[in-house]
């Protein structure tokens, strides 16, 4: 296991590049590696929910995970990912979501229920009400981060890292 000072927790992000460096240098000493993609890409699970990390840096960190197999070809590498959640309201989010979620969490949760759904049965004014219940900047931030996290998780999910 990497040194604790490299790992994140609910209050601070870890150091993905240094965790990767540690795995490259020390990974071959173990029979198997079980890796959190959230730690390797964002710094921690909580950091994956609050980040403003550029997409190109996130994708480079995904490549670091993929390269571990090349570095340690005989070591099975199991990578797990968490899909970004949408708590039902601000009270359920604790301190693990952006600050605006405390105030607008319920409205964001309701909006995301219909965001990619078939809304043909919903009254148009209800859809507008859901969108207007959240400041545009907060909704844009939330949806952008969800989209980024999904895009970054896709290559992790479909690589051949589990052998």
Where are these regions (language model features)?
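Surface-exposed, active-site-proximal loop segments in enzymatic domains
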Residues: 41-53, 91-100
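A short helix->loop->beta-strand "cap" motif at the edges of active sites that frequently abuts
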Residues: 72-77
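Short, well-structured alpha-helical segments in soluble
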Residues: 17-29
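Short loop/turn segments at strand-loop or loop-helix junctions that form parts
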Residues: 2-5, 34-45, 80-84
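Basic, amphipathic N-terminal segments that precede the first structured/catalytic domain
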Residues: 1-20
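Conserved small/polar residues in nucleotide/adenosyl-binding loops
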Residues: 159-162
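Acidic, His- and aromatic-enriched active-site or binding-groove loops in soluble protein domains
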Residues: 97-152
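Well-ordered, non-membrane alpha-helical segments in soluble/globular domains
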Residues: 16-19, 51-65, 142-156
């Amino acid at each position: 296991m990497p040194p604790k000072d490299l790992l994140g927790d609910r209050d601070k992000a870890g150091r993905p590049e240094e965790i990767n460096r540690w795995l490259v240098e020390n990974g071959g000493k173990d029979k198997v590696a079980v890796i959190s993609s959230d730690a390797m890409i964002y710094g921690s699970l909580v950091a994956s929910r609050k980040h403003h990390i550029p997409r190109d840096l996130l994708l480079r960190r995904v490549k670091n995970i993929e390269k571990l197999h090349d570095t340690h070809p005989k070591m099975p590498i199991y990578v797990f990912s968490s899909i970004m959640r949408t708590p039902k309201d601000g009270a359920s989010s604790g301190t693990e979501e952006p600050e605006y979620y405390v105030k607008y969490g319920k409205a964001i949760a309701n909006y995301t229920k219909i965001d990619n759904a078939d809304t043909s049965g919903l009254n148009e004014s209800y859809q507008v009400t859901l969108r207007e219940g959240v400041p545009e900047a907060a909704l844009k931030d939330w949806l952008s981060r969800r989209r980024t996290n999904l895009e970054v998780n896709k290559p992790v999910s479909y690589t051949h890292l589990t052998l």
